[in-house]
């Protein structure tokens, strides 16, 4: 999604949100990420301006004080940015890939089933279409944010094909954007 993303070319406009819209977004985030509720006022303080940065391909990035927090495509689910995920790693359930998959994940490749079932990888129970953080064997922080294309049980049984779709990874265009004023 952000492989060839460039802040100067892809951002079309920025809109400050009304408090009623912010409340709706906060409720949507609580529904989508149940563990975030007690931290939401710390992530999105009430008095700070919340803005939506609109980009090409119907991508919207939610920012507070210029810090990129969440993004979504069209009216789809929100995904946390990796910078937010590094501060609050408990927001998303984790899946772990083995060392051999790291360079492919960091180049934007989807996570294949064998990379999740081999020694060194850890596959935790999760349903299909769950938003997950991809961790790596021997690393502390998440490599990417992805969406489960199969359930964890199916990944173990089938062990072929794409297991997790890579949505946003370290050093992609969104990672390089850092802040937006």
UniProtKB/Swiss-Prot annotation:
Comment field on protein domains: The PUA RNA-binding domain is critical for cap binding, but not sufficient for translation enhancer function.
GO annotations of cellular component type: cytoplasm
Entry keyword annotation includes Isomerase: no
Protein name from the UniProt record: Malignant T-cell-amplified sequence 1-A
CDD domains referenced in this protein's UniProt entry, alphabetically: MCT1_N, PUA_MCTS-1-like
UniProt domain PUA: residue ranges: 92-171
Pfam families noted in UniProt: Pre-PUA, PUA
Keywords attached to this entry: Cell cycle, Cytoplasm, Growth regulation, Transcription, Transcription regulation
Family from the record: Belongs to the MCTS1 family.
Family matches, as InterPro entries: MCT-1/Tma20 (IPR016437), Pre-PUA (IPR041366), PUA (IPR002478), PUA-like_sf (IPR015947), Uncharacterised_CHP00451 (IPR004521)
SMART domains according to UniProt: PUA
Subcellular location: Cytoplasm
Gene name for this UniProt entry: mcts1-a
Molecular function GO terms recorded: RNA binding
Record GO biological process: formation of translation preinitiation complex
Free-text function comment from the UniProt entry: Plays a role as translation enhancer and involved in cell cycle regulation.
Stretches that traverse the bilayer: none
